[in-house]
Amino acid sequence: MGDEDWEAEILKPHVSSYVPVFEKDKYSSGANGDTFNRTSASSSEMEDGPSGRDHFMRSGFSSGRNLGNRDIGESSKRETTSTTGGFGRGKGFGNRGFLNNKFEEGDSSGFWKESTNDCEDTQTRSRGFSKRGGYPDGNDSEASGPFRRGGRDSEYDQDQGSQRGGGLFGSRKPAASDSGSGDTFQSRSGNARGAYKGLNEEVVTGSGKNSWKSEAEGGESSDIQGPKVTYIPPPPPEDEDSIFAHYQTGINFDKYDTILVEVSGHDAPPAILTFEEANLCQTLNNNIAKAGYTKLTPVQKYSIPIVLAGRDLMACAQTGSGKTAAFLLPILAHMMRDGITASRFKELQEPECIIVAPTRELINQIYLEARKFSFGTCVRAVVIYGGTQFGHSIRQIVQGCNILCATPGRLMDIIGKEKIGLKQVKYLVLDEADRMLDMGFGPEMKKLISCPGMPSKEQRQTLLFSATFPEEIQRLAGEFLKSNYLFVAVGQVGGACRDVQQSILQVGPVFKKRKLVEILRNIGDERPMVFVETKKKADFIATFLCQEKISTTSIHGDREQREREQALGDFRCGKCPVLVATSVAARGLDIENVQHVINFNLPSTIDEYVHRIGRTGRCGNTGRAISFFDTESDNHLAQPLVKVLSDAQQDVPAWLEEIAFSSYAPPSFSNSTRGAVFASFDTRKNFQGKNTLNTAGISSAQAPNPVDDESWD
């Protein structure tokens, strides 16, 4: 067909006799509201990446998930105009298609109208016409360029001056605005639910225009905007029994009394031995008793009086040792004593305490603890995090917010939109502070403390808690803490919990899957977590285990928040007794009865290894950690692993010692980013007092590297 014939075909009124058959549930989430189950895909699909969807090849019909931009027709450098039904103005064709499952005004194409309670954004892109078809702006009938769909390329049209961005799968660069006609074509670049760019970002998808936007950059209110994230998490249980459901302590809980604790800094207050010595109010004491707390852990004995005294604190204690209660209880005691300012009757909420953690699951866990200890008081805790509806976060805040628990991206987004005030902030808490201050979230945390209205570090109390504090992180902490802050070191700082039996197995890459199946079948009904390094690998291993008749689910940053919460729920209740995870689940998560941790892939740093195996052996319970050591990729961890195993009084394999001290292993005390010495004591040189710690662990000499393939927020 020549150019003239093609133009005439477009411009003439046309009534197609073709009636597409839409499989209503083919790409939808289903009647029950469940989203796609990633573990049900074939192993070949998980290993090779997402496959292209079948699409209609007639006059702009396509499936709900196109893969980019591709010219239809013989010429890509010619302006066309549409004035009749079918093309443009969102009527059947074009970038609008179906909007909220109903037709635009004046549409008469005869398709059904559908209503659904499913909140997922898939409903606007998986039914009806493609949003990638036709012109990019349904209100501009003069838009330049032919109808484009499919494909994966990007080109710049010199004749028309318009830029069309296609982008490969997972493209991290949004199409730039053009310098000519003002039309920007943007590719969907793969499916919408697997499209996290990086640390704090979420996908903004919509009618013909997509954009990668960070929450901190206003990703939910961009000029180029599609359907917002609509997931609203279910409310937590309100009955008292559920609120105060507590973790069962293990047989080794009493051994905490023998752990060495050192406090460095000026004029540290003495430790307390019982909750009664803290002089907390009666309501707090009642809530502590209901939660099943009878004895203080070492970090609580020293941290509670320090926080009550108003001192800044950096506390380093092993995983599962009660750090959350160590900062929540004294903060609540202060708020109960001094009174609160925020209430639901104020137009602008100004929380007194802000708690920040790197992952959604961890911050929700902290919120539940805050809700537990504040039960029956006038203090109201609120949690906000990415992957949930932005309006839902605002509604939670305006109802009253005294303690704000947040992930960094959503917190900066809320602050940027002036939904909260910071003038009343008295307490700033960074949980998993080493991760909060490293390359992943360091810039955002610096923005937070420099926000207008945020009290200076001299006017607020700042608390940093983690299981690991490398020396570089301690230096960065100087920007957040007063110069006279106190440093609490509990036990072997940066070391692994001795309640965890560690085993290192030398397993090559091709044998790992079969070895994993063998271990899982031998442990019977015990509940294991399997850690891998990448999101793709997590889904692949989960699929493989399901094929081996082992019920498995997965959690990682590319799964929608609804799916992440469902996966954790299925794992907790035993519906899926095996959880395959990336570093999203490595820090802080407190899941009862996790008896095994299996490192299918070892992490890049020893600090991350300590956090991973800390998911078991919590609160005095015993656990086991099995790690697959690959001599082709894990040699940099040989020396730090030997040190961690020795400090935890674990058996060290002879072959591992050989690798650690061979000439092929990196030197132990170097400035390399892997396997160097990390600080196991207060690194300040100018404080008055004696630091008696004389043990040195081995870890990264600098901040832990952010996990390249993981979305933390």
Swiss-Prot record:
The modification Phosphoserine is found at residues 207, 211, 711. A motif (Q motif) lies at residues 273-301. Signal peptide: none annotated. PROSITE patterns: DEAD_ATP_HELICASE, HELICASE_ATP_BIND_1, HELICASE_CTER, Q_MOTIF. CDD domains: DEADc_DDX4 (cd18052), SF2_C_DEAD (cd18787). It is an enzyme of class 3 (hydrolase). Residues 515-660 form the Helicase C-terminal domain. Residues 71-80 have a biased composition (Basic and acidic residues). Its EC number is 3.6.4.13. The keyword Flavoprotein does not apply. This is Probable ATP-dependent RNA helicase DDX4. It comes from Rattus norvegicus (Rat). The gene is Ddx4.
